[in-house]
Amino acid sequence: MTALLKAAEVEHYLHRHIPISAMMGVRVMACDSTGVVLRAPLAPNINHRATVFGGSASAVAILAAWAQLHFTLRQAGIAERIVIQRNQIEYLAPIPTDFEAVCPALPAEALARLLKTFHRLGRARTEMTVELRCAGQVVARFRGDYVAVRLAAGENV
């Protein structure tokens, strides 16, 4: 499977299961072992100052981290429900045009801890980080705590 096909499949999944991602124009640029990169256009996310609305920027960061964790756990053969428990975003500069949310893969030791806890308890928590970038510049930094919970028998994702 090519990376482009995989990114298209991930994008389809997000648009189908998290419809706001389609309304915001979110595109999946990459989803691989190094992380997830989402891209969002200015137009559907614009505010009264002709820059990206802070809530849109935050939503794209939340989505990038969620996608990274979801597909990492899927690759490990885990069916889960993921919720965000808390998050913080620091805006460093206005976002005047299309932007990207870059969520790196979990470090190996964090992933091992997450998987061990999940297998033992049926739930686990981890911190995810995302950088928002515009024209090569980091414009915001996001941190969020996500909780993965094992699906109940018969429950679908």
Predicted region positions:
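Catalytic strand-loop segment that frames the active site of acyl-thioester-processing enzymes
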Residues: 23-52
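Short structured motifs
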Residues: 22-26, 85-90, 113-115
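Hydrophobic residues positioned within well-ordered beta-strands of beta-sheet architectures
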Residues: 38, 85-87, 101, 126-128, ...
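Hydrophobic beta-strand-centered segment that forms part of the acyl-chain substrate-binding groove
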Residues: 69-108
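Short connector loops at helix/strand junctions that flank enzyme active sites
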Residues: 21-23, 33, 64, 82-86, ...
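Active-site helix/loop of acyl-thioester processing domains in fatty-acid/polyketide metabolism
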Residues: 55-76
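Polybasic, low-complexity association/targeting segments
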Residues: 1-13
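HotDog/MaoC-like acyl-thioester-processing domains
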Residues: 95-96, 106-157
